[in-house]
Amino acid sequence: MNYLVMISFALLLVIGVESVRDGYFVEPDNCVVHCMPSSEMCDRGCKHNGATSGSCKAFSKGGNACWCKGLR
């Protein structure tokens, strides 16, 4: 049983664990990036920062803001 645990732990270290998250795209001063209803600017900005895609979230708490999916 101990060998199974040790082998599983070793595999996790060798394979590595990569996590992604969703969230708002922010400027250096930690303010959200506001957008128009067009999502093209958000998609480009999010992809530039390592996300898989981005869109404009209209009428959110912070106003119209860029939402990124799969940020690294």
Curated annotation (Swiss-Prot):
Keywords: Disulfide bond, Ion channel impairing toxin, Neurotoxin, Secreted, Signal, Toxin. Expressed by the venom gland. One of its GO terms (molecular function) is sodium channel inhibitor activity. Gene3D superfamilies: Knottin, scorpion toxin-like (3.30.30.10). GO terms for biological process: defense response. Residues 72 form a propeptide. It is found in: Secreted. Residues 21-72 form the LCN-type CS-alpha/beta domain. It holds the Pfam family Toxin_3. SMART domains: Knot1. Disulfide bonds join C35-C56, C42-C66, C46-C68. Residues 1-19 form the signal peptide. It comes from the Eukaryota. Has the structural arrangement of an alpha-helix connected to antiparallel beta-sheets by disulfide bonds (CS-alpha/beta). This is Probable neurotoxin pcD-993. It comes from Androctonus australis (Sahara scorpion).
